[in-house]
Amino acid sequence: MKKSFILVAILAVVSVGVAVAQPRAIGVNLGYGIDLSYQHSLGEANMIDLSVNIPEFHGIGATATYDWINPFNTAIPWNEKGEWNWSLGVGAGAGIYGFKQPFWYAGVVGHVGVEYNFWFPLQLSVDWRPNIGLTGIDDAFGFNTGGLYRTGFSLGVRYLF
């Protein structure tokens, strides 16, 4: 009986440690179309964000960013129950846009955001994800700068687990 109790106690401590060290989030970003987002923490201050993008509902793409998470001052009154963070990140993205005459795009993606993690498993965020890179249609190639201003801001809603 004593060995069983010790085993259960060790498993409980390890599972709590893993849950704290590896939080995850899944949800959507609404803005320039819709992004289905999965976030995986890499410690307290870093995370990987993987997204499937549906820009203006006229194509499909994917992005992956490595983000640095920075908490706001914890002494401020609005941090009483939840937690405010801001983040910066960089990554890559690619996709196809348009149906009648589709073109492809690929390039570097940036990420700037502010998020609020509630005391229950919900996160709200405001993000800007500019991208710049190459684009092509048929045999023509070009430089995509539209992603710097066209993608705009988005509102994110995620479930934390």
Predicted feature locations:
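A residue-level signal for beta-strand positions that form part of recognition/binding surfaces
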Residues: 25, 87, 154
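Short hydrophobic/aromatic segments of transmembrane alpha-helices and their interfaces
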Residues: 3-4, 30, 149
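Predominantly the C-terminal beta-signal and adjacent terminal strand-loop region
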Residues: 119-161
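Outer-membrane beta-barrel domain signature
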Residues: 24-25, 34-35, 52-53, 59-60, 98-103, 111, 140-146, ...
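Short N-terminal segments immediately surrounding and downstream of signal-peptide cleavage
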Residues: 23-39
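Gram-negative (and chloroplast) outer-membrane scaffold detector with strong preference
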Residues: 42-122, 126, 158-159
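Cleavable N-terminal export/targeting peptides
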Residues: 1-23
